[in-house]
Amino acid sequence: MAEAVFHAPKRKRRVYETYESPLPIPFGQDHGPLKEFKIFRAEMINNNVIVRNAEDIEQLYGKGYFGKGILSRSRPSFTISDPKLVAKWKDMKTNMPIITSKRYQHSVEWAAELMRRQGQDESTVRRILKDYTKPLEHPPVKRNEEAQVHDKLNSGMVSNMEGTAGGERPSVVNGDSGKSGGVGDPREPLGCLQEGSGCHPTTESFEKSVREDASPLPHVCCCKQDALILQRGLHHEDGSQHIGLLHPGDRGPDHEYVLVEEAECAMSEREAAPNEELVQRNRLICRRNPYRIFEYLQLSLEEAFFLVYALGCLSIYYEKEPLTIVKLWKAFTVVQPTFRTTYMAYHYFRSKGWVPKVGLKYGTDLLLYRKGPPFYHASYSVIIELVDDHFEGSLRRPLSWKSLAALSRVSVNVSKELMLCYLIKPSTMTDKEMESPECMKRIKVQEVILSRWVSSRERSDQDDL
């Protein structure tokens, strides 16, 4: 067995992001002289770890590329805006989504169907939707300072880091963060914004005309027990939920209000030429979105446990109760029987500066990125095995020569190297010791790079010598 040759990671041609300081220690330019350590909050729902708070999502993905958006390929960037309309109305300089009238009608129909399933009669459904979707008069401008301060105080538990001589292990209880959601602030309506007009949603004149919506709608409870739905999935003490139509969320005005492009006929031209074809002009009308869709950050079990155990910057809740590190270790093992093995390898590579991601796409356990997926292509495809001192034991995935050659060929075709990561467990380690993450202190790691031997290349190399 020869010593493996290191190949430098291949950088992507086009990079659209800037590299941010990784968790948990911020750089001085990010937070100034006062460095704060924040505890993020996640929830365990249907055997998945979900982060709801928008600020937590941005921090976790931007500083370490943890998790992925449930509606996106990687970075949570889902929006209901129509790209063509956004390009058409680019001079508007607004943060609100711009959608077509047809798309908005679909949202109204979905909201109506949801309320019918909850037992609401047809007249109530029509009355609520008619009041909720009526055009608004003034634009929702930037949030007031009081709401911003309140959001900051409730975004999570922030505590100052105190330097110690040695890195202490996080507390057995995996932290406690504050309320993950922001406060629902009143929004202001927006008048009709005609195409080509000089009306601007963020002008100073509009900022002075901000007023509250004085007609809040009654709450409608959902009898279903779905823990994660497209709307705001907030639980009440009686186990019911409020649908997104009636419960203002914490994701800002872009999820509460939308600009709908609608066509209107020019009255002056109709009066002047009644027999001619009516001239239509498009305009943007601000309406409340009756069926809001939120994107959350989904963490893999390995990523979630690393944030809790290794970095101590995440608190995971199950039914409003924080889970301890030992409980998480046992719960994740029940959910995913191979969790202990995969996490040990994840912890090892993360500690060395790699960004591991799921390697299911290429038939392996992990993919290793330098810095993160936006900057470099994955360098290694990793297969993980837990063995004893003699490299024996029940393998997770017994490989034949045929399957091994297939994996090697797939990895080579996508410019990656196939790595076999052996986690060597002492023969004296008992199953009881494996029930705690402290067992990793006795685990050794052996990395093996698998490369295909090509006879013709070998002969040409010998001829050169």
Curated annotation (Swiss-Prot):
Assigned keywords, A-Z: Lyase, mRNA processing, Neurodegeneration, Nucleus, Phosphoprotein, Pontocerebellar hypoplasia, tRNA processing
Its EC number(s): 4.6.1.16
Gene Ontology CC terms: centrosome; cytoplasm; cytosol; nucleolus; nucleoplasm; tRNA-intron endonuclease complex
Keyword Amino-acid biosynthesis recorded: no
Enzyme class: lyase
Cited InterPro entries: tRNA_endonuc-like_dom_sf, tRNA_intron_Endo_cat-like_sf, tRNA_intron_Endonuc_cat-like, tRNA_intron_Endonuc_N, tRNA_splic, tRNA_splic_SEN2
Superkingdom of origin organism: Eukaryota
Catalytic residues in the record: 369, 377, 416
Molecular function via GO: lyase activity; nucleic acid binding; tRNA-intron endonuclease activity
Modified residues (Phosphoserine): 408, 411, 415
GO biological processes: mRNA processing; tRNA processing; tRNA splicing, via endonucleolytic cleavage and ligation; tRNA-type intron splice site recognition and cleavage
Protein localization: Nucleus; Nucleus, Nucleolus
Region (Disordered): 157-204
Disulfide bonds: none
Pfam families assigned to the protein according to its UniProt record, in alphabetical order: tRNA_int_endo (PF01974), tRNA_int_endo_N (PF02778)
Tissue: Isoform 1 and isoform 2 are widely expressed at very low level.
Catalytic activity line of the entry: pretRNA = a 3'-half-tRNA molecule with a 5'-OH end + a 5'-half-tRNA molecule with a 2',3'-cyclic phosphate end + an intron with a 2',3'-cyclic phosphate and a 5'-hydroxyl terminus
Quaternary organization: tRNA splicing endonuclease is a heterotetramer composed of isoform 1 of TSEN2, TSEN15, TSEN34/LENG5 and TSEN54. tRNA splicing endonuclease complex also contains proteins of the pre-mRNA 3'-end processing machinery such as CLP1, CPSF1, CPSF4 and CSTF2. Isoform 2 belongs to a different complex that contains TSEN54 but low level of TSEN15 and TSEN34/LENG5.
Family: Belongs to the tRNA-intron endonuclease family.
Its job: Constitutes one of the two catalytic subunit of the tRNA-splicing endonuclease complex, a complex responsible for identification and cleavage of the splice sites in pre-tRNA. It cleaves pre-tRNA at the 5'- and 3'-splice sites to release the intron. The products are an intron and two tRNA half-molecules bearing 2',3'-cyclic phosphate and 5'-OH termini. There are no conserved sequences at the splice sites, but the intron is invariably located at the same site in the gene, placing the splice sites an invariant distance from the constant structural features of the tRNA body.
PANTHER family: TRNA-SPLICING ENDONUCLEASE SUBUNIT SEN2
Disease cited in the entry: Pontocerebellar hypoplasia 2B: A disorder characterized by an abnormally small cerebellum and brainstem, and progressive microcephaly from birth combined with extrapyramidal dyskinesia. Severe chorea occurs and epilepsy is frequent. There are no signs of spinal cord anterior horn cells degeneration.
Identification of the protein by name: tRNA-splicing endonuclease subunit Sen2
Source organism (scientific name): Homo sapiens (Human)
Chain's gene name: TSEN2
